[in-house]
Regions:
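Flexible "arm" and connector segments at domain edges
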Residues: 1-104
Length: 104
């Protein structure tokens, strides 16, 4: 995420004094709620969906994830790369390529 966007999210939260409500537990709940709203976009069809609604719900998920990263003082690149390293070890290409059972 671009620094300008991160700063905008932080300012939005700060201007409203909402950080006091952003406990890790509350943020995790909010991420889950918004992820389910994203899932709702695909409730009745795997192929037909309203992209503007998908974008809105996906943005909500990302904003709450960004807030959690800040709250826990985590670096998104660092934690994603750590997880990708574990996934690469767990699902080597030669064993997992094209194997539906090993889809992460």
């Amino acid at each position: 995420m671009k620094q300008e966007t991160i700063d905008r999210i932080r300012k939005f939260t700060e201007d409203r004094d909402w950080d006091q409500f952003h406990t890790p537990a509350n943020l995790a709940k909010s991420i889950s709620i918004e992820a389910n709203e994203l899932l709702e976009c695909f409730q009745w069809s795997d192929t037909e969906y309203d992209i503007s609604h998908v974008k809105e719900e996906l943005a909500d998920v990302l904003v709450y994830c960004r807030n959690m990263l800040d709250k826990l003082e985590l670096d998104e690149d660092e934690i994603v790369n750590e997880k990708m390293s574990r996934n690469e070890a767990k699902y080597p290409v030669e064993k997992a390529k094209g194997d539906r059972k090993s889809v992460v």
